[in-house]
Regions:
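Short, surface-exposed "cap/lid" segments of acyl-processing enzymes
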Residues: 52-55, 60-83
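Conserved alpha/beta-hydrolase "acid-adjacent" motif
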Residues: 240-249
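Catalytic histidine-centered segment of alpha/beta-hydrolase-like enzymes
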Residues: 269-279
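Short beta-strand/loop motif that positions the catalytic acidic residue
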Residues: 227, 233-235, 239
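Mobile cap/lid helix-loop segments that gate and shape the active-site cleft of serine hydrolases
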Residues: 24, 30, 40, 184-223
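N-terminal cap/lid segment of alpha/beta-hydrolase-fold proteins
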Residues: 4-55
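Primarily recognizes the serine-hydrolase "nucleophile elbow" in alpha/beta-hydrolase
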Residues: 118-188
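Catalytic nucleophile-loop/oxyanion-hole region of alpha/beta-hydrolase
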Residues: 72-81, 92-133
Length: 295
């Protein structure tokens, strides 16, 4: 049974079911198309299209979780992608280089994600995608990357993460238990998730905020506020992987920068219920996607 590696924030709280037990015991649905956006074997995405292709569909650019590690891939996102496309939303689920893959971390993973996001315009030349309604969304570590995409127009031009001015606008950003602020994650989690005696955030970013401040200024969504788009932060009340105070703390900082950010805490849901379309939590989450995708 696969689960994201961590030491639970709530060590005395027993999850009501083993993470991923239901969705990983089944073969995920197949996407309509698997399309490379780069030359590396990890630079591809799965495209899910609504059955009615007569009109252009809003599109969710989705980033999977797994603490940016190569042990975890996009396969499990097939379940939510299939559900969203059945409700009229296209999904471009992105794979990217993760820790353990050559060139991953800072800046490689960020550049992969930026290139895959901009590749949506290429997809729209062939498939009926509404480029004025592109939503970035992600689960866990993927939530960090999704919100980073929404804020990268603020990246300093001298940064390694600076790319030509983004040509594709973000309509809204949705975090599913995302680590949307790396500084807050390190502080609130008290370094509860480690690799080689240091927080995994530091592995991914190339050091701590004190060691590589420029990396965090360019790669942390909290440093890129205001994002300038509606932001939706969704988390299960029983989540034992992501700091429970993170969504509210992030939203408060966003509001202070005059951004629009809402927090939805779902009673009884854990870290994985919110990406499982068979869970009780999912109808609430689907409704947020549907509302966010409207013009």
């Amino acid at each position: 049974m696969r689960q994201f590696p961590s030491h639970p924030i709530h060590p005395n709280r027993t999850p009501k079911r083993p993470p991923f037990m239901d969705i990983l015991s089944q073969m995920p649905p197949r996407a309509d198309h698997r399309i490379p956006y780069g030359k590396d074997e990890n630079q591809f995405g799965d495209l899910w299209l609504p059955h009615d292709t007569r009109t252009k569909a809003p599109v969710v650019v989705f980033l999977h979780g797994g603490w940016w590690q190569s042990t975890y891939d996009l396969a499990y996102t097939g379940f939510l992608a299939d559900d969203l496309r059945n409700h009229g939303i296209a999904v471009w689920s992105i794979e990217y280089r993760r820790l353990g893959n050559p060139g991953a971390g800072y800046p490689g993973t960020f550049l992969d994600v930026a290139n895959a996001f901009e590749f949506t315009r290429t997809l729209a030349a062939t498939y009926p995608l509404a480029l004025d309604r592109v939503i970035t969304s992600g689960h866990s570590a993927g939530g960090h990357l999704a919100f980073w995409l929404a804020g990268r127009h603020h990246i300093p031009e001298t940064s390694l993460l600076a790319t030509p001015k983004p040509g594709l606008a973000v309509h809204a950003a949705i975090s599913l238990a995302g680590v949307v602020d790396l500084r807050l994650t390190r502080d609130l989690a008290s370094g509860w998730i480690f690799s080689h005696d240091k927080p995994l955030v530091d592995d991914f970013m190339g050091g701590s905020p004190e060691q590589v401040p420029d990396h965090y200024r360019a790669g942390n969504p909290g440093d890129l506020l205001p994002l300038g788009v509606p932001q939706f932060l969704i988390q299960g009340a029983e989540d034992n992987q992501v700091p429970p105070d993170l969504p509210a703390r992030y939203a408060a900082n966003a509001h202070a920068q005059h951004d629009t950010a809402s927090v939805t805490i779902i009673p009884g849901a854990d870290h994985f219920d919110i990406v499982d379309p068979t869970s009780r939590a999912w109808p609430t989450i689907r409704d947020i996607f549907l509302r966010a995708s409207k013009p």
